[in-house]
């Protein structure tokens, strides 16, 4: 799953439209007479001018002018003068309104320098204070912004709910959107742990809706019925008045299963074997679907035996309402262009990812992408606490692609540079590894010292200590060579890096070399399969290799996604437990696969 890398945000940059509205409402022009001071208004003069007026006044009016001077000093970005004014006001007897404004300004000054916790501690309005409404609005808005900066979304939401009750109708819709966005930051596992107080009925309603959306997404009919019932029972709740778009989209969704499906694969030619395994997995899933419609049809088309025109004619004559495939990138693009020229776009799940995705084509994309797998590895290594990885990959175009994918994902989480080595000739492999870990440099330094001194040194070559994880893109035989080379290159008194590998190393065959301690990634079907599925597959295809199982799993997931994609497009964060991974979609409708991890030699 995608990991959120939180960053504290500056409160001034978080000025929401609602906050701006509150500020503007307090910006009424101050009277020309200096006898009347509205301390909730924005400063129109300089801090020095207000200070001169304060020095010419006394009592409450003097305090009012000091507060306006403090406001102006903060606006002028003069923290030193602001701090002096805060200290001066601290010695004065203040009315509740002055005390409230003083708290707001102290907190804002601290928030401006990202001292958020200290800012929060300044804000302690008393419930019995009789204050102008704008001060209560500013109080809740500032607390909401500070909580947001502290990544405390639920506390921020609590403040926004309080602000909602004090706001004008023109601000309420934007506030409702902000409340909903805050709650959507939470995952299903975290949101169910949140709770409200007995007197927080409005917040509790928002929370309940968010929990429904996060936990019932896998059963869309139940989610739809639950939402409809809740909204009918709570017609005056802000969520019923300003219903979030994510909810209205679900309420408007008509759940329709495809009736006539076409499976487009190159069943002859270069990729015939791969296509046949995908077909087998698709049909296997279809035959195991207890909810399959009795009138459902499947048309399998060999894309190498038909022209584009004849494929289109078959789709039309068979009244196809969903297409799975093609498998070849070029065929995907050609079919999309042909359908667009005809103005007939059939919902499609392509079984590859084109280099350039046409977002107007309305298609989704599923593939066993090596780039997706190594990107997952980069994320996994970081979440496991590793900070200085090395990636070893073949010295070819494939190796360069996966290294680029690993680097791109790693940069999302860390500024540390990834060490990279591409291996080619296996005879050079040990030399490459020694070079990576600095062993050759260490040996050369020792030789130079011995030459200079004219005598032998009792010393041991030292390996570099910064690499804490090695991700190896290699098949099983390559991994059996690489692992001992790494072990030899590491000094006995140093902590060895953790070794990881991709799914190519998991052949499913007998391992004649010790690969224990190497953690590898692969699809769930090969790491933790459902017992019933594993038993059926073994009975039907007892001789299938792991590579063939992955293709069958791709076909199985393609069938499942036919039904699930409409929900996935609408329900934010919607995932399904597939055979090739935990499946979700991105903004281009490319299916993302969260793969599984296991250790070689552990069953």
UniProtKB/Swiss-Prot annotation:
Top-level taxon in the UniProt lineage: Bacteria
Protein's GO biological process: peptidoglycan biosynthetic process; regulation of cell shape
A Pfam family that the UniProt record links to this protein: LppC
Membrane topology, as annotated: Lipid-anchor
Main location: membrane
Signal sequence, start to end: 1-26
Lipid anchor positions (N-palmitoyl cysteine): 27
Keyword presence, Lipoprotein: yes
Residue positions of covalent lipid attachment, annotated as S-diacylglycerol cysteine: 27
Entry function: Regulator of peptidoglycan synthesis that is essential for the function of penicillin-binding protein 1A (PBP1a).
Family of the protein in this entry: Belongs to the LpoA family.
Listed name of the protein: Penicillin-binding protein activator LpoA
Annotated organism of origin: Vibrio cholerae serotype O1 (strain ATCC 39315 / El Tor Inaba N16961)
């Amino acid at each position: 799953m995608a990991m959120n890398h939180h960053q504290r945000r500056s409160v001034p940059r978080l000025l929401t439209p609602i906050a701006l509205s509150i500020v503007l409402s307090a910006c009424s022009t101050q009277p020309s007479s200096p006898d009347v001071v509205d301390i909730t208004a924005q400063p129109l003069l300089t801090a020095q001018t207000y200070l001169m007026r304060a020095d010419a006044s006394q009592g409450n009016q003097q305090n009012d002018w000091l507060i306006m001077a403090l406001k102006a000093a903060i606006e002028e970005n003069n923290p030193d003068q602001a701090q002096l004014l805060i200290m001066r006001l601290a010695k004065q007897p203040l009315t509740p309104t002055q005390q409230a404004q003083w708290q707001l300004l102290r907190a804002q000054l601290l928030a401006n320098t990202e001292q958020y916790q200290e800012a929060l501690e300044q804000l302690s309005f008393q419930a019995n204070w009789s204050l102008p409404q704008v001060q209560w609005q500013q109080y809740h808005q500032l607390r909401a912004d500070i909580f947001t900066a502290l990544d405390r979304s639920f506390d921020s939401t609590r403040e926004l709910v309080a602000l909602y009750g004090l706001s004008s109708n023109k601000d309420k819709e934007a506030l409702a959107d902000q409340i909903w966005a805050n709650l959507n930051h939470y995952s299903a596992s975290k949101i169910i742990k949140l709770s409200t107080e007995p007197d927080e009925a409005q917040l509790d309603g928002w929370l309940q809706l968010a929990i429904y959306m996060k936990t019932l997404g896998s059963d869309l009919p139940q989610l739809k019925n639950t939402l409809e019932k809740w909204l009918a029972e709570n017609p005056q709740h802000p969520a019923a008045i300003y219903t979030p778009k994510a909810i209205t989209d679900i309420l408007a969704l008509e759940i329709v299963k495809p009736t006539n499906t076409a499976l487009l694969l190159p069943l002859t030619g270069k990729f015939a074997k791969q296509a046949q395994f995908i077909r087998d997995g698709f049909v296997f899933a279809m035959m195991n679907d207890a909810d399959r419609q009795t009138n459902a049809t499947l048309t399998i088309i060999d894309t190498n035996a038909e022209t584009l025109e004849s494929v289109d004619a078959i789709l039309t004559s068979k009244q196809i309402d969903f297409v799975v495939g093609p498998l070849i990138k070029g065929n995907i693009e050609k079919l999309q262009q042909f359908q667009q020229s005809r103005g007939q776009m059939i919902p499609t799940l392509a079984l590859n990812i084109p280099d350039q995705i046409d977002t107007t084509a309305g298609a989704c994309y599923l593939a066993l992408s090596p780039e997706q797998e190594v990107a997952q590895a980069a994320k996994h290594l970081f979440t496991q606490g590793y900070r200085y990885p090395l990636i070893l990959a073949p010295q070819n175009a494939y190796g360069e692609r996966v290294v680029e994918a690993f680097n791109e994902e790693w940069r999302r989480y860390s500024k540390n540079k990834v060490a990279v080595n591409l291996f080619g000739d296996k005879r050079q492999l040990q030399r490459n590894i020694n070079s990576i870990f600095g062993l050759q440099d260490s040996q050369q330094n020792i030789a130079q010292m011995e030459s200079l001194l004219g005598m032998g040194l009792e010393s041991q070559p030292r390996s570099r200590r910064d690499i804490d994880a090695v991700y190896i893109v290699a098949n099983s035989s390559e991994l059996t060579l690489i692992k001992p080379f790494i072990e030899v290159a590491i000094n006995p008194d140093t902590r060895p890096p953790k070794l990881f590998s991709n799914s190519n190393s998991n052949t499913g065959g007998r391992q004649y070399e010790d690969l224990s301690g190497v953690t590898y990634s692969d699809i769930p079907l090969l790491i933790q399969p459902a017992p019933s599925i594993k038993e059926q597959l073994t009975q039907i295809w007892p001789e299938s290799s792991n590579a063939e199982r992955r293709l069958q799993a791709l076909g199985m997931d393609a069938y499942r996604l036919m039904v699930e994609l409409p929900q996935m497009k609408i329900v934010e964060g919607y995932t399904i437990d597939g055979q090739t991974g935990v499946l979700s979609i991105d903004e281009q409708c490319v299916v993302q696969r969260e793969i599984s991890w296991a250790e070689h030699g552990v069953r």
